[in-house]
Swiss-Prot record:
PANTHER family: LARGE RIBOSOMAL SUBUNIT PROTEIN BL34M, MITOCHONDRIAL RIBOSOMAL PROTEIN 34 FAMILY MEMBER. One of its GO terms (molecular function) is structural constituent of ribosome. The gene is rpmH. InterPro entries: Ribosomal_bL34, Ribosomal_bL34_CS. Keywords: Ribonucleoprotein, Ribosomal protein. Signal peptide: none annotated. The keyword Protein biosynthesis does not apply. Belongs to the bacterial ribosomal protein bL34 family. This is Large ribosomal subunit protein bL34. Pfam families: Ribosomal_L34. One of its GO terms (biological process) is translation. GO terms for cellular component: ribonucleoprotein complex; ribosome.
Length: 48
């Protein structure tokens, strides 16, 4: 049986990236909370 996590940078960015977060109200809420907590990284797309 193969493992469930098969890493892909493209899929990761499309699902959890900045543009994906901005696309929905709940995603924008996530960004707002992460800014409030002063997270070093807002989204996975800021990994580069």
């Amino acid at each position: 049986m193969k493992r469930t996590y098969q890493p892909s940078k493209l899929k990761r960015a499309k699902t959890h990236g900045f543009m994906a977060r901005m696309a929905t109200a709940q995603g924008r809420k996530v960004l707002r909370q992460r800014r409030f907590k002063n997270r070093a990284q807002l989204t996975v797309s800021s990994e580069r």
